[in-house]
């Protein structure tokens, strides 16, 4: 373990008490609440539990798996049990990724505080570790696991077991020779320092040594000029290579003398390539680096579908935890489906299903607390309102009272309504997206023009089941006729629009007597396109994001405003992409749109968001509770720009006159060739950690997502029985027509002859954020959490103007 952890374990009173152990109640559901004995292990990195202090304990969690510790008051489950347990005695362990939270109740407030402080201290310590400290900690954990008799020494038999734990199968004779080399005391066992040498021998990076020696004249060090040459030729650093070389030597060269002489040793070279500076993801793309002052329609927006669900779409649980997790992932558009609930309180759930229900006001309280913890750019609340008039008034009250100043209630001062505000202008604000009684008004003249448009749309044919398909195209009318008919139109009795004809009687029947007749007969009231009566109080809270039905791109261009937004099912959007890709691009350059998963995805699976991003769809809503390649692509895109949830679209997707069509792309430049060499892997985890004797046979699949012409994949052969340092050395070529839209995904799998290859890890990033040269790819789990130190070592470069056949 690191010296810092050792010192804390010996001196910190909270950690000392945690090492002694505590009986606490583990809470899974309202009815499942059982006493368990929890204890922090001596390594300071693992918490074990058992039914009793003397029982055989089992590992519960590693500190590296924990994101944060929450107090009991913030636990949805513990709040339900407040009559059984004081909230002050409870706390929640929140894990990275999609792993369920662990709710615990201590026997006293003091005990709860001890565990909360102690765990958070260790979590913060792990988060602050650099790469070398993380490696030291991992080596300590491996040593502790292999040292079965806990004597602080490792025999060869224990070392053989360790090799299996480390995911490598090695010839016994060769393994014994490495063991003997490390056993400098010739005691037939290894101490902790000798074990480190044994590990280094096991994981010797010969492929990196070869690269080093290619640029080193004496094969021992890189001079400043040699390192600059490497950075320019291989890492494509170009003009700033000399300054960068000095900076990297100062940062990674372990020898003080080497730093003074401006030279880089083999160890320093390895440290550089294994650091964040040697990562494939360009660190320049990690903070906010894009222009955030453009209209909202110019950005991809990280969006969630049915955010309240943490399971499937039919019987899954609804929970405010769904909102917390989505917001934690940088989501900037969450969905809220509201229905009438008991006691006059609206509830949120997936209507007409067996999903559980949560209170609307609890959702808002969660948003108020977590909306801007991961990103301070605007949060969009996509409201699917199914409530009656009275409960809509309650919704409006809760929105204004609970969200307070966070809620955007008026247009921005000085901003004309013919221009959408930017993410920068809306920082710290929550916007309601939903239906609205009337459009945003600028002046009296524009209001009258809008009334004329609505009157023309209202004058549809009488309802007749046998009527032929209605012609939605406007009929030609001379200027004289238009002027002459204007007054006549205003005299006519207003009719329901086509979408409301079937439900007029129902609407009037369910309207509360408290609604004035003037409102019931108003145009704004009758313009609703559903059976729900729209309450003016709720309508007034929809400022910039008015939901409107989609008829056609021509209709939208001629009748809708820049603040109008339409939603499309994934199948509808795909058809429009194929039939009118360029019109879709122009539509999305002008106004926002939202794409949501098919209703047939009852298992909460996801579709590929890339094909919708290709036409500039801003809000591609994902089932964030479901892991898989689609969520990997989504997470990969929004990993950049500070994790703000907003990514600026390419310029050709922001131009309302753009000629771009992803189905038939014509690149402004000659197609480029992406070269990817998959070289080696490091410390790949086991697929099944319960099977100590199994070792993975890894292969790497390189996937490219973009316009249809650019979407393809290639994979390496598999390496047998080696998860610790497999070597592939295979090169692939990908032709890129539109690299600005490309997403690159590396997937490591365990080869199986009898069944599907098993997932080990993955990493996905945009082409625009890819660093060229020799780079490490840090692998993530299926849940998107770090598998550190697992990685693959690759070489990438772009070859322009290369005339070659498709590989």
Swiss-Prot record:
Induction: By treatment with growth factors such as bradykinin, lysophosphatidic acid, and Ca(2+) ionophore in addition to serum. Its EC number is 3.1.4.11. A motif (GBA) lies at residues 213-243. Residues 443-462 have a biased composition (Acidic residues). Signal peptide: none annotated. Coiled coil: none annotated. Keywords: Calcium, Cytoplasm, Endoplasmic reticulum, Hydrolase, Lipid degradation, Lipid metabolism, Membrane, Metal-binding, Nucleus, Repeat, Transducer. Residues 538-654 form the PI-PLC Y-box domain. Residues 16-124 form the PH domain. A motif (PDZ-binding) lies at residues 776-779. Pfam families: C2, EF-hand_like, PH, PI-PLC-X, PI-PLC-Y. Its cofactor is Ca(2+). Ca(2+) 3 binds at residues 306, 335, 337, 384. It catalyses: a 1,2-diacyl-sn-glycero-3-phospho-(1D-myo-inositol-4,5-bisphosphate) + H2O = 1D-myo-inositol 1,4,5-trisphosphate + a 1,2-diacyl-sn-glycerol + H(+); a 1,2-diacyl-sn-glycero-3-phospho-(1D-myo-inositol) + H2O = 1D-myo-inositol 1-phosphate + a 1,2-diacyl-sn-glycerol + H(+). It is found in: Membrane; Nucleus; Cytoplasm; Endoplasmic reticulum. One of its GO terms (molecular function) is phospholipase C activity. This is 1-phosphatidylinositol 4,5-bisphosphate phosphodiesterase delta-4.
């Amino acid at each position: 373990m690191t010296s810092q952890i050792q010192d804390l374990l010996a001196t910190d009173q909270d950690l000392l008490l945690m090492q002694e152990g505590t009986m606490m109640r583990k809470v899974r559901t309202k009815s499942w609440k059982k006493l368990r004995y929890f204890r922090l292990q001596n390594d300071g990195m693992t918490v074990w539990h058992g039914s009793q202090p003397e029982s055989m304990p089992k590992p519960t969690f590693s500190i590296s798996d924990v994101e944060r510790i929450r107090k009991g008051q913030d636990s949805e489950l513990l709040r339900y049990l407040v009559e059984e347990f004081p909230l002050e005695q409870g706390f929640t362990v929140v894990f990275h990724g999609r792993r369920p939270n662990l709710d615990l109740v201590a026997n006293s407030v003091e005990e709860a505080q001890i565990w909360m402080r102690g765990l958070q201290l260790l979590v913060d310590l792990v988060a602050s570790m650099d790469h070398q400290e993380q490696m030291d900690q991992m080596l300590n954990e491996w040593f502790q696991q292999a040292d079965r008799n806990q004597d602080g020494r490792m025999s060869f038999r224990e070392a053989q077991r360790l090799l299996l734990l480390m995911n490598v199968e090695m010839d016994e004779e060769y393994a014994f020779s490495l063991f003997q080399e490390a056993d400098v005391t010739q005691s037939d066992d290894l101490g902790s320092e000798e074990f480190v040498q044994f590990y280094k021998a096991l994981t010797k990076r010969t492929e990196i040594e070869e690269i080093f020696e290619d640029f080193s004249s004496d094969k021992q060090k890189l001079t400043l000029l040699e390192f600059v040459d490497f950075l320019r030729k291989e890492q494509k650093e170009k003009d700033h290579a000399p300054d960068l070389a000095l900076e990297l030597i100062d940062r990674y060269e372990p020898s003080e003398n080497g730093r003074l002489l401006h030279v880089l040793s083999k160890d320093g070279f390895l440290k550089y390539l294994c650091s964040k500076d040697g990562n494939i993801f360009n660190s320049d793309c990690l903070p906010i680096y894009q222009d955030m002052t453009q209209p909202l329609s110019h950005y991809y927006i990280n969006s969630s579908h049915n955010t309240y669900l943490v399971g499937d779409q039919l019987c899954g649980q609804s929970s405010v935890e769904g909102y917390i997790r989505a917001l934690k992932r940088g989501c900037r558009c969450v969905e809220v489906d509201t229905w009438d609930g008991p006691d006059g309180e609206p509830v949120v759930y997936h209507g007409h299903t067996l999903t559980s229900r949560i209170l609307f006001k609890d959702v808002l309280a969660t948003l108020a607390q977590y909306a801007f913890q991961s990103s301070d750019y605007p949060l969009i609340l996509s409201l699917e309102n199914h409530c009656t008039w009275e409960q809509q008034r309650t919704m409006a009250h809760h929105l204004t009272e609970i969200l307070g100043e966070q809620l955007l209630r008026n247009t921005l001062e000085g901003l004309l309504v013919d221009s959408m505000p930017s993410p920068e202008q809306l920082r710290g604000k929550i916007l309601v997206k939903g239906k609205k009684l009337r459009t945003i008004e600028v002046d009296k003249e524009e209001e009258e023009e809008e009334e004329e448009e609505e009157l023309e749309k209202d004058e549809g044919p009488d309802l007749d089941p046998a009527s032929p398909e209605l012609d939605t195209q406007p009929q030609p009318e001379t200027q004289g006729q238009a002027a002459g008919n204007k007054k006549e139109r205003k005299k006519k009795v207003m009719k329901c629009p086509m979408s409301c004809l079937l439900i007029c009687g129902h609407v009037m029947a369910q309207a509360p007597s408290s609604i004035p007749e003037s409102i019931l007969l108003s145009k704004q009231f009758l313009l609703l396109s559903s059976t729900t009566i729209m309450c003016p109080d709720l309508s007034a809270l929809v400022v910039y994001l008015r939901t409107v039905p989609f008829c056609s791109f021509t209709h939208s261009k001629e009748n809708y405003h820049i603040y109008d937004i339409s939603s499309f099912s994934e199948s509808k959007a795909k058809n429009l992409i194929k039939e009118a890709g360029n019109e879709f691009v122009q539509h999305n350059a002008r106004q926002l749109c939202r794409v949501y998963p098919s209703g047939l995805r009852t298992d909460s699976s996801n579709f590929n968001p890339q094909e919708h991003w290709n036409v500039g769809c801003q809000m591609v809503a994902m089932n964030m509770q479901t892991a898989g390649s689609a969520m990997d692509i989504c997470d990969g895109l929004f990993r950049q720009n500070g994790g703000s949830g907003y990514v600026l679209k390419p310029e050709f997707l922001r131009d309302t006159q753009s000629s771009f069509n992803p189905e038939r792309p014509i690149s402004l430049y000659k197609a480029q060739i992406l070269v990817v060499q998959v070289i080696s892997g490091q410390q790949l985890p086991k697929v099944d950690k319960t099977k100590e004797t199994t070792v993975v046979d890894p292969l790497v699949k390189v996937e490219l997502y973009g316009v249809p012409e650019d979407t393809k994949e290639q994979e390496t052969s598999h390496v047998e029985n080696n998860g610790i340092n497999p070597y592939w050395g295979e090169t692939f070529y990908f032709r890129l027509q539109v690299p600005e839209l490309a997403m690159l995904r590396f997937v490591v799998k365990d080869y199986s002859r009898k069944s599907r290859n098993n997932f080990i890890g993955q990493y996905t990033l945009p082409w625009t954020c890819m660093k060229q040269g020799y780079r490490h790819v840090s692998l993530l789990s299926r849940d998107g959490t770090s598998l550190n130190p697992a990685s693959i070592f690759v070489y990438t470069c772009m070859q322009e103007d290369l005339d070659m056949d498709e590989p």
